[in-house]
């Protein structure tokens, strides 16, 4: 099995691709850049976009994981939805299955969330709604990591010191959530 991960520092943090490979037994390749949005992955005029296009045109994948910039579904929803649609078309043309990696709200009470003047519950809800809408509209699988973070946030330290990125435990939960979606999909094919 081969998995391509498209994202940014949320996707590369704490060796997430290697953790996903360990949990699935798959070869995992990552096309990511810190701060990248899915629109950049779709734009072949960017370095990252040309890497993504080459990977989708020249290699075979079983799954492609899509991760948008942390608050992109809220601050740039039009770009988010159109980028998911465009990438899903390319992924399916490759013969692969797209998976949306639904991200989390910044840490409750954290400096970054406070500085933006955002409400934790509202951000978590809006992100979840956007990812689920994109999944429905594009008939994709969804790894709802944001929901797992929301459920576990009061009981575990899921965030790095910046209150934005995942801690090692947070990245492990990301890997487990994505692996679970893949394993369930593989079992359903039997």
What is each residue range found by the language model?
Residues 2-6, 10-85:
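Conserved SGNH/GDSL esterase-like catalytic core that processes O-acyl groups on lipids
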Residues 29-31, 99, 141-143:
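General small-molecule cofactor/ligand-binding pocket signal
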Residues 89-99, 140:
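A short helix->loop->beta-strand "cap" motif at the edges of active sites that frequently abuts
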């Amino acid at each position: 099995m081969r998995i391509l991960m498209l994202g940014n520092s949320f996707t590369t943090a704490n060796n997430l691709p290697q953790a996903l490979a360990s949990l699935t037994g798959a070869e995992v390749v990552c096309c990511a850049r810190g701060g990248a949005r899915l629109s950049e992955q779709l734009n072949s005029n960017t370095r990252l976009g040309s890497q993504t296009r080459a990977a989708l045109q020249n290699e075979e994948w079983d799954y492609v994981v899509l991760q948008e910039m942390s608050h992109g579904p809220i601050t740039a929803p039009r770009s988010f939805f159109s980028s998911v649609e465009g990438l899903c078309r390319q992924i399916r043309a490759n013969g692969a299955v797209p998976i949306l990696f639904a991200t989390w709200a910044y840490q409750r009470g954290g400096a970054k969330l406070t500085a933006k003047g955002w409400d934790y519950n509202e951000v978590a809800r809006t992100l979840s709604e956007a990812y689920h809408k994109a999944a429905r509209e594009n008939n994709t699988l969804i790894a709802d990591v944001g929901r797992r973070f929301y459920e576990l946030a009061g009981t575990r330290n899921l965030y790095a010191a910046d209150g934005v990125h995942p801690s090692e435990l947070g990245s492990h939960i990301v890997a487990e959530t994505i692996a679970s979606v893949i394993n369930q999909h593989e079992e359903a094919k039997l």
